[in-house]
Structures are given as C-alpha cells and as structure tokens.
Amino acid sequence: MTQQRTLARYLTEEQRNKGVITGDLKLLIEVVSRACQAISIAIGKGGLGGVLGEAGSDNVQGEAQKKLDVLSNDILLDANEWGGHLAAMASEEMDLPHLVPHRFPKGEYLLTFDPLDGSSNIDVNVSIGTIFSVLKCPEGADLSTPEAAEQAFLQPGTAQVAAGYAVYGPTTLLVLTVGDGVAVFTLDREQGQFILTLENVQIPADTKEFAINMSNQRFWEAPVQRYVAEMQVGKEGPLGKDYNMRWVASMVADVHRIMTRGGIFMYPMDSKIKGQGGKLRLMYEANPMAMLIEQAGGAATTGRQRILDIQPEKLHQRVPVILGSKNEVERVTGYHSA
C-alpha cells in the first residue's frame, strides 16, 4: 500500500531533498493550511454557526463585508502573527498592513491574502476560497508603522516564493506552488490533514471553455469583444471549434476548474472600471493566481502585460486579468497589440 503524502511531508521533501524552500517557509505554509482548515470548518457550519449574512461593515474597497469575510480574516491573522515566520501581513479586508505585535518574534516573510474570495456566493452555498501569496521581506524594510510597511509589499509577482488557494466546496482542497510545479492536496477531515492527491498539474494549452461575466459585454474593450465574438461563432468561425461558457463569479472556483481541465478566465478592462485600473486586486488575487497558472504551464496577462512583471504602486492596486490555457491567453493578448 502506498503511503499517503501529507502536506507536511511534501514540504519537508521540497526543503530537504530539493532545497526549494526554507524551514521557516515550510512552517509558514503549514500554519496557513491550518487556518484554511479552520475556515473550512466555519463555512461548513453555515447557519448553524451563526456565520452567514452581512457583517454590517465595508472593507477598504467599499464592498459590504460578510460575517465570514471578517471571521476568515481574523482566523488568518490570529494563526500567523505569533509563529515567528512573518514580518507583516496584508489582506483585502484591511486598509493597511498588519504588523506582527512586539510581543512576538518577527520573521523574514510577508503574507498577503484574500481571506474569502467569492463571498457573495456564501449564502447560496457555492464554492468559495482563500487566496494567499508569500514574499520575502526586503532587508532593512521600514516596519515601524503600518503606513511605512506598505512599501515592503510592493514587489512584482516574480518575487513570490509561494502562492496558493484553498477551495471550500464538496471537498476542501489546497492548491499550492513553491516554485516547483503545482500540487493539489485534499483535506482528510478525520485525520485533520491535507493529503497530496495530484502533483505536477499541467493545464492543456488549448481549450473549448471560457469564463467571463457576459453581462459586462457592452463595456469591454475591442480586443475582448473580438475574441468572445469569435468563440460564440463556434466552429464556423476563425477559431474553428465550438466553445462552452462557465461562470461561477468566484475566482477560486473558476480558476480551479481551469487548473483541472483547462480553459480561459477573463476579467478584462471595461469602461465602467477603467478609472480604478481593473476589477481584481494585483497583490492577493492576480499575482498568486498568475504564479500558479504559469507553474502549471498556462499564461496570465492583463491583455497587454504579463501579470507577474507588474511593479505594484499600491497595496490594493487593481488590474485586468486574462489567464489559463496558454494558446488562448496568447491569442487574446495578441489581439490587444494588433
């Protein structure tokens, strides 16, 4: 019988045998995974736990917070601030970085996260998730105040040392990269551990599925209008094949489908959101997903630029996102430069 490989064993092998990660990064990822387990338990209780519904507050983006948004954010903060692996954390739900309290030791890493992606789907029981990214804290970074600490986070996605997401669906999955391919872990609730169930994930280069919010079609730029119109024409058109559309309105769920069977996900620039730069947040949504997608052989761009090459200007910066099967992403990106 083949012995199960837990997340802890997988990370130990990445550290000991391959030298890909440090001991502190291994421990940090394990702590994040335990926080995701706690979030999964809270979500699973639903109305029985009194965690559904609105929190009665807005986040820094002006979005109404769900009770589970706030709870998930608190779980991640509480789990990670005392372990000695982090210098600071940043979240979609907080205006400024969260500094490690003085009573705890500080480490060399920075953690950014969207504690509960797709939270508008909570009350209708659709898959949601947690997205996270890990960066090295620059030497000599000013962490004296939350305002000063923001500068330490403003690194391009190529600087990420790990990225991942948890999917809270029929099963709870953790999808992870430490820069050595993509691995998928399934939560064994009886053991209370994530078990490796898929390694070296590869996204097909071609696809017949696309994910986009068609209700925004009239606001899209011409290159995306062209690409979607060509897909809708099907095999009689220039792409020569019929496409299916899928849209969950939960980035984690949509991206995980692409990670599993290929496809292209688009939240492109449109005229409604041009002033804010895009819809999705660069630091804790686009960058970690782009790292995962590229590690699995896909591509991720804004339509005009590789996402991982963007130099962030602010913590909550937004960007257009086009990611997934490489040939499809390159096609629509090429339309932007035509």
Swiss-Prot record:
Give the protein family: Belongs to the FBPase class 1 family.
Q: Does the keyword Metal-binding apply?
A: yes
- Which residues make up the binding site for Mg(2+) 2? 114, 117, 285
Keywords recorded for this protein, A-Z: Carbohydrate metabolism, Cytoplasm, Hydrolase, Magnesium, Metal-binding
**Main location group:** cytoplasm
Q: Name the residues that bind substrate.
A: 117-120, 213, 279
Recorded hits in NCBIfam families, A to Z, give: PRK09293.1-3, PRK09293.1-4
Q: What GO terms describe the biological role, i.e. biological process, of this protein?
A: fructose 1,6-bisphosphate metabolic process; fructose 6-phosphate metabolic process; fructose metabolic process; gluconeogenesis; sucrose biosynthetic process
Record-listed E.C. numbers:
3.1.3.11
- Pathway entry: Carbohydrate biosynthesis; gluconeogenesis
Q: Where in the cell is it found?
A: Cytoplasm
The top EC class, named as a word, is hydrolase
Q: Which cofactor does it need?
A: Mg(2+)
Secretion signal, residue range per the UniProt entry: none
* The protein's name in its UniProt record: Fructose-1,6-bisphosphatase class 1 1
Q: Report quaternary structure and partners.
A: Homotetramer.
Q: Name one GO cellular component term.
A: cytosol
Q: Which GO terms describe its molecular function?
A: fructose 1,6-bisphosphate 1-phosphatase activity; magnesium ion binding
Catalysis performed (reactions)? beta-D-fructose 1,6-bisphosphate + H2O = beta-D-fructose 6-phosphate + phosphate
Q: Where are the transmembrane segments?
A: none
Checking HAMAP family in the record gives: FBPase_class1
Binding locations of Mg(2+) 1: 92, 114, 116
Q: CDD domains annotated for this entry?
A: FBPase (cd00354)
Relay the cofactor remark from the entry: Binds 2 magnesium ions per subunit.
